[in-house]
Amino acid sequence: MMNRMNRAGRLWWGGLWLLLAAFASAEEAKTTANNPPKKADAGDFIRVRRDAKKTPLAMETAIVHYVPADKGKKSPTVDLVSAFHIGEKKYYEELNKAFENYDVVLYELVAPLGTRVPKGGGNKDSMLSKVQKFMKDTLALEFQLDQIDYTKANFVHADMSAADIAKSMSDKGETWMTIISRMMSYSMAQQAKNGGDDGSMELFAAFFSKNRPLALKRAIANQLEVNDTLSALEGPDGSTLISGRNAIALDVLKKQIAGGKRKIAIFYGGGHMPDLDKHLRADFGLKPGGTRWLTAWDLNDKAVEKKE
């Protein structure tokens, strides 16, 4: 019975990580970082903030500000704005306000070149939309495409189309099945390395919690700190889903800089950021100049804490 529960738990978590990877590109939040190291990791862009008792208080994403390494230059500046695609309404309101201050915001969206997202999101009847609605309702959160205003004049599409992804994957010998298998195998190996805890018991308890959305979000936050499944995609030649799409964004960045834009944001999932960081340093002569953290998920139940 317990073995069946554990297997079911692994399958559930494996499926959840694939969904979160698709929606959020989130990776392991390893450390806090006021001054990102020479080689950035995912913890510089997405982290779980905890109290002294190690209770998760917030899932946070970073806006990392890059400035010219040459002290004689003041521009261009580029901000890597990490996206968590399921979040609090207030989180997206903060992002919308921040985006008003940029000359241009380069955004990810697997769609034909130049695609614009209408206000309130796109097609609500698609299978993906139904999955999103289920997750939104279960976690009591909002979705990025519904809340971010992509109609603003300074928003520029900077991503592959589905056809581009299919061609790139074919050229690299990648398939969706091999990607899924690689990610799940890596995730299970990491679970074994961490004592075999797949989070199934915490998840099971969360479903029966008086505050189910909060309990589920905390369970997911705990798992994000022991899962780095997207790193399994990147090999010596990179991958379509990370470095391939990043290459498109960086090409658009070059064109925007050449066109005179000086204050630029790249709005992409956190899993893309270590590779983008590497290229901003090596190819654009930029370095991190500061980090601002935003709360994507509020995991603090003040009412419960007062009772305890």
Which residues does each PLM region occupy?
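Bacterial N-terminal signal peptides that target proteins for export
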Residues: M2-W13
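Bacterial N-terminal signal peptides
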Residues: W13-A22
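Sterically constrained small-residue positions within well-ordered secondary structures
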Residues: W17, T55-L57, I257
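Structured, acidic catalytic/metal-binding patches in enzyme active sites
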Residues: A29-T240, G244, G289-L299, V304-E305
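A cross-kingdom marker for long, charged
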Residues: S239, S243-E308
